[in-house]
Amino acid sequence: WEETLLILPRGGKPSILVGNEGIGYIAVSPVEMNIEFYQTFSLMGQPNDARSRRLEEILKDAIALQSGKLGVIGFKSYDPALHTIGAFVTDVPHYIIQTLERIVPAQLLKNATDLLADCEYGLKHHVSAKEIVLYELTGTRVSRGVLNCLQKLRPGMSELEASRNCLFDGAAANMHPNINFGDKNLSLGLASPTDAKRLQLGELVGAGFGKRGCLVHKIGMYVE
């Protein structure tokens, strides 16, 4: 529901900035960190008062850098050659970048998202044996749910009715269900199931959903 900013120094204790909701959750973390209450990360309409320091003041205390590089991690990496705004391209909110540039030289900022998310060497591709087992288990459960949904399709059934056959449970999801009938609904790409659309013979059918570690989606034509 709100943003969080983690600052990892080369040496010393990490710092984390959390909003109104995060301040209640951070206490359960086993990692020793400097916790900073920063209400600007909270939802609009929630309290944002004098209990929070200004961002520049917080970052000055947490960052001491005059040489080397300061890695900024957002959602994606970008090839500077494809842009016209210089070597540093990031999707981290502009007000955070502007504040950082008041503390450290702008030329020291670098998009470091690739360290986590690069498709070849990013940390997300280095998984433990336990994680491999969990992903395999999740893949089996999701694929069986999609298969069960397809096997129980009947003419006149709504997309919403069909979605109930996906064997959902409370495991963490990475996307909403996509159960769609007919050219129009399938063409929407990632549409949620509706109660209005009813299945007819000869129609295209798409069925899929995802849980943490796996996503399965199948498309075919419904025939007897």
Residue ranges and their predicted role:
Residues 8-10, 18-20, 74, 181, ...:
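Pocket-edge structural micro-motifs
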Residues 14-15, 23-25, 78-79, 212-215:
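Short, acidic Gly/Pro/Ser/Thr-rich loop/turn segments
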Residues 5, 95-99, 202:
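Acidic, His- and aromatic-enriched active-site or binding-groove loops in soluble protein domains
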Residues 43, 47-175:
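Flexible, acidic/His-enriched mid-domain "rim/lid" segments that flank
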Residues 1-53, 197:
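N-terminal accessory/capping or targeting/presequence segment of soluble
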Residues 1, 104, 110-126, 157-224:
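Short catalytic-site patches enriched in acidic/histidine residues
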Residues 1-3, 13, 65-69, 202:
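A general structural motif
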